Amino acid sequence: MPDIKAFSPRGMFHEGWTAEVSDYAIACGWALKGKQFIVGDVAGGLFAFEGDTGKIIWKKENTHSGGLLAMTIHPEGEIYATSGQDGKVQICNCHDGKVIKTLDLGKGWVEHLKWSNDGLFLAIASSKKVSVFNEVGEKKWISEDHPSTVSAITWSNKNELATACYGRVTFFDILNNKTNQKLEWQGSLVSMELSPDGDIV
């Protein structure tokens, strides 16, 4: 049947590639429009793999003293940020892994990072406070102390940041420095997810 043409199957899983990093993988994500897959391990190692083949592109060891805690990749996929037990956040280039800027948040662990959907802001949670920096590392906003350690952060829309801690979820307007809403809950909140429109927690 000469009219049959080969095609690339879509909409189903196919065997791809596997790879191993130096320690327990704690964070990962796609960069450079799917051309690169970055994995971070608990010891502070970072590994960039070629998206199609799994071939290692670059790797870095001991990026954070005491270990890596979080990683987030910018929506445009050109830069990423990592944090660790050393109280520092590193903003790095995805192409080669080189550090562009280091933010020093003090002695506390920096446990959560999240770029805003438009990529203009980076939210950083350390202990009971949340800070927001722009993409070149300038501080734009900082919260007051939460009642307990911040357990999760996410952006609900362009300028609104949601945080979770013991007993509540809070929505902050970071541009106008005000609290939009507090949702009280009797108990420990260890994670948080919002619906795509930001209306459901």
What kind of feature is each model-predicted range?
Residues 18-44:
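Beta-strand-rich domains and repeat architectures in extracellular enzymes and scaffolds
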Residues 51-53, 94-97, 134-138, 174-177:
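Short loop/turn segments that connect beta-strands within beta-propeller blades
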